[in-house]
Amino acid sequence: MNRIDKRFAALKSQQRRALIPYITAGDPAPQHTVGFMHACVEAGADVLELGVPFSDPMADGPVIQKACERALAKGTRLTDVLDMVATFRATDAETPVVLMGYLNPVERMGYEHFARRAREAGVDGVLMVDMPPEEMAEVAPLFSEHGLQSIFLLAPTTSPSRAATICRHGEGYLYYVSLKGVTGAASLDVDAVERQLAPLREMTDLPLCVGFGIRDGDTAAAVGRVADGVIVGSALVSRIAENAETPEAIPAALKAVLGDMRDALDRSDGR
């Protein structure tokens, strides 16, 4: 069983929600990323999303765009990101790792080469923002052969027929984008999210995890009452940016944000 499936099965049996942090690999410099990954796990992360830096991250807001710029300026490439996962795996064989990014770097490497390298490194899932399930269907068997799950995004603007297609092709978990627009947007209507998730639960048994707008323990707990997991990105990447000149301070900053969210989720009264 894939590490992602194992983790969500364990969480379900414990009636707990997943805490899924996102950080951009190589930000502020490649040598720090593995330490940040371990810090996230120590703070209570259940799954790690590791962003592959790309020069045109169209779905991301300015916070993550700048993180990509910092990582690329330090020479971070897809092959480096895979090396980071391999290094992480040397001391953590349990925490699922999902690579999140855009199609271009994977296409340049070649799907088969990427899938093999990702398997060898210990990657569990892949979420390519700009690759729809119809196109992913062509490479999904290759990914599956190498133990990589294909994870997809859903949004408030996704039509019911489109949502059904995504649910049919999805694996691991579904990433529900709670807000229209780009990452880092401000307002979050949890009641609206609950209404939007309801029909999706009729379509799939996959865990539904919500991202965009998760800023602190309160928003994490509120979303955790209606979703199977919360995904936090910009709130963490902002802390990395604030401490880019003193990277030794970043693990504690990440732990502070995630620790607050973990505590809030665990205190939550359930759904």
Swiss-Prot record:
Its EC number is 4.2.1.20. The active site is at 49 (proton acceptor), 60 (proton acceptor). InterPro entries: Aldolase_TIM, RibuloseP-bd_barrel, Trp_synthase_alpha_AS, Trp_synthase_suA. SUPFAM superfamilies: Ribulose-phoshate binding barrel (SSF51366). GO terms for molecular function: tryptophan synthase activity. It comes from the Bacteria. It catalyses: (1S,2R)-1-C-(indol-3-yl)glycerol 3-phosphate + L-serine = D-glyceraldehyde 3-phosphate + L-tryptophan + H2O. It is an enzyme of class 4 (lyase). Pathway: Amino-acid biosynthesis; L-tryptophan biosynthesis; L-tryptophan from chorismate: step 5/5. Pfam families: Trp_syntA (PF00290). One of its GO terms (cellular component) is cytosol. The keyword Amino-acid biosynthesis applies. Keywords: Amino-acid biosynthesis, Aromatic amino acid biosynthesis, Lyase, Tryptophan biosynthesis. Belongs to the TrpA family. HAMAP family: Trp_synth_alpha (MF_00131). PANTHER family: TRYPTOPHAN SYNTHASE ALPHA CHAIN, CHLOROPLASTIC, TRYPTOPHAN SYNTHASE, ALPHA CHAIN. The alpha subunit is responsible for the aldol cleavage of indoleglycerol phosphate to indole and glyceraldehyde 3-phosphate. Tetramer of two alpha and two beta chains. This is Tryptophan synthase alpha chain.
